[in-house]
Amino acid sequence: MALFYLDSSAVVKLVRDEPESHVLRACLSDEDLVSCDLVLTEVPRAIRRAVAQDPRLALDVLIERAEAVLEAVALLPLDRALLLAAGAFAEPALRALDAIHIAAAIDLSPVDGFVTYDERQAAGARLAGLRTMAPGS
């Protein structure tokens, strides 16, 4: 089995039915998945934003799906060393939460892929030496 690090944009695509979701689910179906504790906040926030923009979406159903998806993803705890590593990246355009995800993936290295649908984060991950993926995009 391969090990893939998922950022929040990838986790959300596993929860919601978005254009890339089917391909992403197929690509990751038998793989080991990992992220960091940051997704415990980012994913529910993204779901709540989506429901606010599209009232046809059912918040309770999506939150339940998110909980099920997150149970299948190993979560790396955020600690001082990880946060300091994220803060030390030289790339000035790298946003704080993106830097935390990249630092977490590096901490787990080697990972077979860093899965993100955020191009700015993907660029930062590549600069840090990670192989990025966005299945279906």
Residue map of PLM features:
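Short, well-structured N-terminal submotif of metal-dependent ribonuclease cores
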Residues: 1-39, 51-63, 128-130, 137
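Alpha-helix capping/helix-boundary segments
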Residues: 10-11, 39-40, 82, 101, ...
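Short beta-strand scaffold positions
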Residues: 6, 35, 77, 96-99, ...
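Acidic catalytic patch
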Residues: 64-92, 100-102
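Acidic, PIN/NYN-like endoribonuclease modules and their adjacent C-terminal/linker elements
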Residues: 1-3, 103-137
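Residues that scaffold the ATP/ADP-binding catalytic core of kinase and kinase-like folds
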Residues: 14-15, 46, 124-125
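Short active-site oxyanion
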Residues: 30-33, 71-74, 109-113
